[in-house]
């Protein structure tokens, strides 16, 4: 890493550098930073930082979302799309990160993408737990289809109606070529 930094910033060649390891803490006086490695929570070299004085987790790509910084909008919709688009295939690594983070007293989460989270943190952690365990958020049936001539669409709609008639309480159907699947 130092070699790469010096290639981009040769003026830092003579500056003192510190290599940190997973779980190490750097005491800066009024702030203490603990480094939490989170490999494959998007990239192999991902590292998060926990600041224990203010109880802030700088979470890198974890707990991020697409869209504006507004926390008044439905966080879960764009966070879900972000999670499954960016880190969704690394559920085991996210599970390991959640276990590490469980031991930290976190009052604020600062992701690289999306709003700073400082209320209802259990809501966000629980969603990440559900997503990373590949568990459904709700019980129901999701029918995804695409149809060039309309025949598959008719079959999908018929199947959806049959499921409702049989008592399935939640049936969602979407045309993968035309609908916004983030919704």
PLM regions with names:
Residues 1-119:
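Metallo-beta-lactamase
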Residues 3-5, 66, 118, 180-181:
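Generic structural signal for helix capping and beta-alpha/helix-loop junctions
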Residues 9-12, 50, 71-74, 124-126, ...:
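Short, glycine/charged-enriched secondary-structure capping and boundary segments
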Residues 27, 50, 134-137:
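Short, flexible hinge/linker loops that cap or flank conserved catalytic cores
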Residues 121-183:
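N-terminal beta1-alpha1-beta2 submodule of the flavodoxin-like/Rossmannoid cofactor-binding fold
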